[in-house]
Amino acid sequence: MIRVLLVDDRADFRRAFARLLERQPDLEVVAAAGSLAEGRTQLSGVDVALIDRGLPDGDGLELIGELRAVNPGARVLVMSSTAEMRHPTEAVEAGAEGVIDKLDDSERVFAAIRGTGA
């Protein structure tokens, strides 16, 4: 079972995406947060963190280093809109395993989560 932390500021997206993830037999959403502050309280006990870049209280990339300090084995996928996908190197340089497009096909997102090696 891959334990997932979902950090996105849009509550409707978080709920819908969490439901999609929970339908997968090997994925479990163990925490969801809408801001950096909330995300910081949920960093332990996750295998993969899906982190949005544009959070109301800062850049989601800030959580990557904090996650690594608390949970060194966790993997990170940064979620981004299509426009932000033009510069994925920032996320990878910050320590993410990759970047996924929020609007991408759900099967591709599931494959990316599974492909992190978590």
Task: Label every model-predicted segment.
Residues 61-73:
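Short amphipathic alpha-helix used as the core "switch/output" element in two-component signaling
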Residues 86, 104-117:
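C-terminal output helix
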Residues 1-12, 17-21, 49:
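Conserved acidic segment of CheY-like receiver
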Residues 32-48:
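Acidic, metal-coordinating helix/loop segments flanking the phosphotransfer/catalytic sites
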Residues 56, 84:
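The feature encodes the CheY-like receiver
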Residues 35, 59-62:
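Acidic catalytic/metal-coordinating carboxylates
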